[in-house]
């Protein structure tokens, strides 16, 4: 970045940060007050929460023309995205390459994280952004209510509930400087059949070209809900969602290619197809004003099939056509809330989850004249079944002091079945080729017991201000794939054996303040420290030419500390709105062979700033700035010791978005430019193997919405 451009953007950040001198009462896009969130599993006012929670209205994201949830969340305070070779995963509070198992993503309280952590990416693309009512972000923790995998935090995506008659259509178009047209077409509506029965739907289709040549996504979303008011005390919601897409990609670029022309085709040719159906049931019963009961049951399935997967390597081409993954989660949750005193409640419940993952890996190549063919087939069937009980009490002693505390117990059983078949034909000096055809089978079963608890005293020191302290002990359970190791030396011993892993245990200490000062701006600040023990580490090389081997084991300890700051101000009777945020993270390995090293893929600083100005009730503009500081890539890891080295810097970058919104009667028009200054940045970097993926350059959008 040229110095003058960087100075301009930093100056604009500074301007926005000090622009609260004459601000009026905040009614910001990112709200921490007077909104309804589900941090207890039951809807309540945000004022009743005892810790800092960010609630983002879906309409505020939809009004900025985003085409995906990932694109929208990337601009949100405290959230980053990490790609360590599998795809992009949401990261919070510096989880790095553990982000896919240490940040829990939910839809209406149902987890969508996949079970196969070694090859899994949380399926954000399957979420229809136009069907989002709001997004609740709970930084750091949540183990008592949500179980394993919340060290970084919880993101709960609440979908729309529309019962009254409505119908709307929307058309969205997107393009890059060099072309790459794409768009979305959708309809949504609702019909109230009678006073006790209603139905809503949202159908969106999309066909989007990527920034890089050879990238395309096309498919559709179907989201439906049926609402049944059984009587005055109970209601039932039945949901069905379906997502299907076909994605084409062309793989990585070298650094030289990325610098010369980041839009050019990569070194591979891949086509994947994704199918994801979901069924859910949500039942509420209100016994009286004191006791509320909630039953949730759901089933979700995701299949990823590699229709074409080719990569050029060492003067040959390897084919993985026919490979794929399947992830199925079935669950039930029984929750109760007792409001036993004024502003005091007790929540308790039981959860069951059966999570199954299947992996099919097919690799084929030939290298004439020596290798006629080499075909490797790996089949894995992994299951985790868990039973959990939990309780959380919040007691309001007086108008100044509230104490919250809770605990969770989780019992889990694991089963992993693995099959590996190796087929090879090699030419030698003998007249006939050598034929190898061997199959290795392995299975293992494990049981685990895990506990979590938290305590949070909250002090209301003024009419507008709250101060809280929180201690939480949580856990990140191993995944079934991590219970299987492979020997380095055979010598007649079985190639596979079970690993004796413990869950990762973390302790989080948090101090937060939320206030509304002098009647002109809101202030929110959080300080946290997280120490994680028994982190699961990895040794080996599954692709070694001398024989694949790997080992999962508990050894590492990490510590993460940080600061999260959010501000927002309004001017001119809410016509001019400013927003600012700053997140600072210091994430390091604090024990073991890599003691003192930074956790890869984690930026120390993320800053956001923005303004919105309404010229009148029908026309408004916005500008958003997002900054990520540099981070270390994965470097290389010694397969015998686990020592990291040669971790190169991933460059820092600014993103600048501008846009407008215009309303005319029932028509709404959105238009804007994302990455206005065409900043070049990497969404994936492997400097050792010279592999890079480039983020989207300057792109333009326009959208039309019409409500009948």
Locate predicted features.
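Transmembrane beta-barrel wall of Gram-negative outer-membrane proteins
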Residues: 168, 177-207, 211-250, 270-292, ...
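Outer membrane beta-barrel strand-and-loop segments of large Gram-negative receptors
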Residues: 320-338, 378, 386-390, 496-502, ...
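Extracytoplasmic beta-strand/coil segments of soluble accessory domains associated
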Residues: 70-111
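Surface-exposed extracellular loop regions of Gram-negative outer-membrane beta-barrel proteins
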Residues: 246, 252-260, 356-370, 413-438, ...
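Conserved C-terminal beta-signal and adjacent last beta-strands/turns
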Residues: 190, 325, 393, 469, ...
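N-terminal periplasmic "start-of-domain" segments of outer-membrane beta-barrel proteins
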Residues: 32-64, 89, 223
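Short acidic/polar hinge/loop motifs at secondary-structure boundaries
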Residues: 110-139, 160
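Gram-negative outer-membrane beta-barrel transporters
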Residues: 341, 396-403, 411-412, 522-533, ...
């Amino acid at each position: 970045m040229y110095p003058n451009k960087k100075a301009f953007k930093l100056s604009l950040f500074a301007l926005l940060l000090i622009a609260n001198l004459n601000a009026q009462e905040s009614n910001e896009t990112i709200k921490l007050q007077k909104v309804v969130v589900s941090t207890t599993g039951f809807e309540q006012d945000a004022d009743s929460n005892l810790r800092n929670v960010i609630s983002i209205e879906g309409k505020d994201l939809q009004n900025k023309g985003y085409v995906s949830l990932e694109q929208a969340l990337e601009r949100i305070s405290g959230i980053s995205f990490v790609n360590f070779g599998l795809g992009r995963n949401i990261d919070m509070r510096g989880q790095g390459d553990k982000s896919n198992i240490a940040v829990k993503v939910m839809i209406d309280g149902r987890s969508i994280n996949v079970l196969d952590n070694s090859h899994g990416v949380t399926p954000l693309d399957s979420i229809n952004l136009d069907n989002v009512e709001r997004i609740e972000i709970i930084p750091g923790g949540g183990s008592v209510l949500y179980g394993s995998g919340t060290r970084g935090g919880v993101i709960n995506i609440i979908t729309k509930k529309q019962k009254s008659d409505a119908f709307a259509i929307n058309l969205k178009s997107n393009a890059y400087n060099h072309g790459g047209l794409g768009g979305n077409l959708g309809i949504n509506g609702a019909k109230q059949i009678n006073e006790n029965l209603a139905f809503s739907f949202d159908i969106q289709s999309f066909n989007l070209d990527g920034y890089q040549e050879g990238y395309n996504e096309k498919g559709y979303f179907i989201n439906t809900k049926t609402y049944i008011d059984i009587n005055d005390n109970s209601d039932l919601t039945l949901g069905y969602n379906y997502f299907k897409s076909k994605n084409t990609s062309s793989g990585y670029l070298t650094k030289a290619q990325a610098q010369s022309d980041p839009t050019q085709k990569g070194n591979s040719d891949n086509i994947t197809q994704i199918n994801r159906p979901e069924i859910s049931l949500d039942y509420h019963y209100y016994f009286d004003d004191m006791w509320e009961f909630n039953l949730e049951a759901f089933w979700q399935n995701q299949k990823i099939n590699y229709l074409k997967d080719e990569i050029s390597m060492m003067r040959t081409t390897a084919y993985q056509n026919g490979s794929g993954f399947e992830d199925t989660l079935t669950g039930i949750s029984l929750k109760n809330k007792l409001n036993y005193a004024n502003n005091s409640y007790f929540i308790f419940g039981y959860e069951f989850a059966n999570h199954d993952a299947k992996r099919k890996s097919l690799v084929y190549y030939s290298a004439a004249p020596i290798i006629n063919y080499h075909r490797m087939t790996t089949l894995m069937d992994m299951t985790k079944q868990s039973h959990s009980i939990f309780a959380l009490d919040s007691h309001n002693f007086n108008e100044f002091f509230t104490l919250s505390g809770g605990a969770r117990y989780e019992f889990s059983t694991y089963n992993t079945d693995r099959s590996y078949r190796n087929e090879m034909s090699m030419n030698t000096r003998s007249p006939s080729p050598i034929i190898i055809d061997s199959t290795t089978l392995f299975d293992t079963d494990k049981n685990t017991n895990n506990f979590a608890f938290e305590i949070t005293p909250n002090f209301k020191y003024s009419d507008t201000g709250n101060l809280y302290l929180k201690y939480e002990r949580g856990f990140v359970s191993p995944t079934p794939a991590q219970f299987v190791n492979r020997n380095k030396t055979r010598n007649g011993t079985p190639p596979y054996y079970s690993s004796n892993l413990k869950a990762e245990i973390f302790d989080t200490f948090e101090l937060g303040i939320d206030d509304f000062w002098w009647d002109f701006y809101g202030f929110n600040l959080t300080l946290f420290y997280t120490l994680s023990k028994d982190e699961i580490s990895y040794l080996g090389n599954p692709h070694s030419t001398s024989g694949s081997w790997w080992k999962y084991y508990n050894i590492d300890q990490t510590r993460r500390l940080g600061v999260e700051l959010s501000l927002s101000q309004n001017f001119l009777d809410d016509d001019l709105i400013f927003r600012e945020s700053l997140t600072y993270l210091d994430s390091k390995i604090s024990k073991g062979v890599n003691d003192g090293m930074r956790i890869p893929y984690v930026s120390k600083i993320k800053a956001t700033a923005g303004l919105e100005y309404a010229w009148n009730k029908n026309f408004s503009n916005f500008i958003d700035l997002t900054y990520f500081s540099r981070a270390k890539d994965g470097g290389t890891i010694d397969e015998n010791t686990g020592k990291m080295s040669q971790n190169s810097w991933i460059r820092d970058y600014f993103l600048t978005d501008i846009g407008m919104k215009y309303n005319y009667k029932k028509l709404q028009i959105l238009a804007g430019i994302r990455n206005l200054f065409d900043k070049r940045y990497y969404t994936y970097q492997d400097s050792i193997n010279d592999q890079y993926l480039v983020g989207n350059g300057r792109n333009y959008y326009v959208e039309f919405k019409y409500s009948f």
